[in-house]
Amino acid sequence: MYLNKINLFLVTNIFLIFFLSSYNDVKSEEVKIISGIAEVTDGDTIRIEGKKIRFFGIDAPEKKQQCKKPWLTISFISFSKDYPCGQISTDKLKKKINNKLLICKWTNKDRYKRYIAECFKDKTNINAWMVRNGYAVAYRKYSKKFVSQEIFAKKEKLGLWSGTFMMPWDYRKNN
């Protein structure tokens, strides 16, 4: 048990050194880092060591949110069926990062006291990965950073873009 904690500490610090050295465009005193084993809450929120982290610049469907997917098309008539897109978004994120080492670079906190962050698993930007695969959308109200990933997912009809859905912010407003 003690050796596992030492190994986790060493791996985290080595990863932090690599991470910080690869971001030489950011002054070290401005970089605020949270790192550790990720625990997925939903498609855009995680916990690391009890700290709640909301992914910067993206918005995933709510856990109970349903979306529509084409089911059958006959001539010019199309039938669709509901599917649990919010739960799928959460499950895909869990498969990718749950119980894995993450490094999150945060800038501020929101009104719910969550850290707003970009998170990385190895060299993969998880925020970008969620949007590029269609499990979340770019949250343009706060940032345009992930718009190109959204355009790609939409063009390729990935995830949410394979059917129709209500934008997460509209769903929250109506439910």
Named regions from a protein language model:
Residues 2-175:
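Small beta-barrel nucleic-acid-binding modules, primarily SNase/OB-fold domains
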